[in-house]
Amino acid sequence: FSYADADGKFSGIDVDVCRGVAAAVFGDDTKVKYTPLTAKERFTALQSGEVDLLSRNTTWTSSRDAGMGMAFTGVTYYDGIGFLTHDKAGLKSAKELDGATVCIQAGTDTELNVADYF
């Protein structure tokens, strides 16, 4: 939920969270160094101390909460899973998509949740 514009200035809700923490901890919301990370890099960067705070899309699971040596501070964004189809399909339930080809980002909790659903 953040991006860097053409000038390299970061914006978005994740950036706002980081600025809020910097303001609370350092008294200055500009005392932030943004480090773009992929989903694969994020936990290693936090565990190694490369970053002090991870503010990005990360599903709070019991295995992550208990087994990764990190502390989730609270939910900043709550989402769900939905399916978008053409209205001509006439579907009344997501269950009618069983056996259909569904586009999902690989390696995400959403992928696992959808596989469990069907």
Specify the residue positions occupied by each region the protein language model found:
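Ligand-binding cleft/hinge of the Venus flytrap
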Residues: A4-D7, R19-T30, T110-F118
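Short glycine-rich His-centered loop
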Residues: F1-I13
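Short, well-ordered beta-strand elements
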Residues: F10-S11, V32-T35, G99-C103
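Acidic, polar ligand-binding/catalytic clefts
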Residues: R19, A23, G27, K31-E96
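Histidine/lysine/aspartate-rich catalytic loop segments that bind and position anionic ligands
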Residues: T76-G82, G107-F118
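Short coil/turn segments
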Residues: A6-G8, T59-W60, H86-G90, V102-T110
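Short, well-ordered beta-strand segments
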Residues: S2, L54, L84, T101-C103
